[in-house]
Amino acid sequence: MKWALIVIGVLVGIAVIVVIIGAMLPKGHVATRAARFRETPEVIWQSITDFEKFPSWRAGVTSVERLPDRDGHVVWMERGGHDAIPYELMESVAPSGNSVGRVVTRIADPKLPFGGTWTLEIAATDGGTMLRITELGEVYNPVFRFMSRFVFGQTKTMEDYLEALGKKFGETVSIQE
């Protein structure tokens, strides 16, 4: 009985520490990752804007459902193993010649324990394309904030996205900060 109480006490203590540390962390964060691809900017652009085909190359996305537009913006629901997250396309400018393409998406559900935007910039390089993702994220729940910062990492989803895009084209990409 004594050991059970000690174990319970330690677990409660750890939980309290996680909540306290999470509460002390800032809600917002900025993270950036990039990768080079052999494909042209137009091919990369087509892949990252054709959200209905995400399940064919993004391992964590099992289905995509088009939702009604919101304030003139395209909205869709991405479903994965444990969740469904709606996204809103805030900005979409295709790359053209030497001009950089830009896509801005936003998590479109304020009830989730996290939110924010991704800005994807598509630029031509010698022999291919550079795709840079910048996340302006917010994590509202202190426990999730702790987990995001110290367990999962705030760049994991971006890195998975870039690696999956490379795999779609038969490339092994090198992730850059």
Which residues make up each language-model segment?
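Beta-strand/loop substructures that line and gate deep hydrophobic ligand-binding cavities in soluble
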Residues: 88-91, 104-167, 171, 175-177
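Short coil/turn motifs at beta-sheet boundaries
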Residues: 26-28, 80, 113, 126
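Hydrophobic ligand-binding cavity/cleft-lining segments
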Residues: 4-68
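Intrinsic-disorder/low-complexity, polar/charged segments enriched in Ser/Thr/Lys/Arg/Asp/Glu/Gln
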Residues: 28-36, 84, 102, 117, ...
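Broad hydrophobic/π-residue packing in well-ordered secondary structure
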Residues: 45-47, 54-58, 74-78, 105, ...
